[in-house]
Amino acid sequence: MLRSHCMEFSEELKTLKDQVRFDGSFRTGTFSNIVIAGMGGSGIAGRIFSEMYSAKPVFVCDDYHIPEFVDGNTEFIAVSYSGNTEETLSAAEEAIKKGAKVHAITSGGRLSEMGVDTIKIPGGLQPRSAVGYLTMPIINTFIRPKHEDIEEAAGLLSDLDKNNTVQENIATEIYAGRRIPVIYGSTPYRSVAYRWKTQFNENAKILAYSNYFSELNHNDTMPLRDTYRKDEFYFMAFDSTDERIRKRIEVTQKITGTSFKKIEARGSSLIARIFYLIHFGDYVTYHLARIRNVDPQDVSAIEDLKKRIS
């Protein structure tokens, strides 16, 4: 059951800590850029990392092909939980041909047989339920967070495991109005807003939309004021420590006549706040799936698509 996988998230963080990383020193001067390839639940790892790391350029590749700049100075990380993701395998093969330093995070499959530096993670999960296993090796390798920051994150996640009534109430409100979730983030939580969107898609089996401040003020502002059937959407916005973003959130609500459900990140460290928000969204979507009486782990349509195009 997905709930049990949710509750394993904090244990993933405690288990992985900073001892799980790729081989090599990865000193800043030894590479020019980082490319992280991954799709779906595996692809979120690169998106999360890209908002936490800025010492070198980070490119998230969710395609068959890699960017032209990839060369021998590129640290290329292929992330595929199954090890058989078509797009990621194609990208990894191209990276090898271009002489990049290629690494992999996977539970097995063809990716584990490519002969590259590989971190093997436990199997038997849905990729989206293995976000800790998929993300922490990258964070540990390039950022090396403090032990106490990871412990803080694990503790906050454990608290959510014990009490997720707030998340259940949000799910109930969404279901009661048969509303479409809209999730607004801002740096460094843009990828988390996208993660929420995909969790609503896969877990609760409903459409959802995500965007981020302040970019959304250059496009979403007009429809927020003038669109039809606005009452069919459920708007949520992550709070920000940036006063300019906070002001934008408040002014956007006032001039468009829209109310946002404010979601506040907890934790003193960035890694704690990011993983807290991820876990928060996981529970909202789990509860919505339960209320809708749908199996949150069912991905039969996705598997059918893969079979038909293979």
From Swiss-Prot:
Annotated function: Dual specificity isomerase that catalyzes the isomerization of both glucose-6-phosphate and mannose-6-phosphate to fructose-6-phosphate with similar catalytic efficiency.
Catalysed transformations (reactions): alpha-D-glucose 6-phosphate = beta-D-fructose 6-phosphate; D-mannose 6-phosphate = D-fructose 6-phosphate
What's the protein called, per UniProt? Bifunctional phosphoglucose/phosphomannose isomerase
Q: What positions does the entry give for D-fructose 6-phosphate binding?
A: 41-42, 80, 82, 85, 128, 218, 306
- Spell out the activity regulation: Inhibited by low concentrations of erythrose 4-phosphate and 6-phosphogluconate.
User: What family, per the record?
Assistant: Belongs to the PGI/PMI family.
Q: How does it assemble?
A: Homodimer.
What are the catalytic residues? 202 (proton acceptor), 218 (proton donor), 306 (proton acceptor)
Q: Which GO terms describe its molecular function?
A: carbohydrate derivative binding; glucose-6-phosphate isomerase activity; mannose-6-phosphate isomerase activity
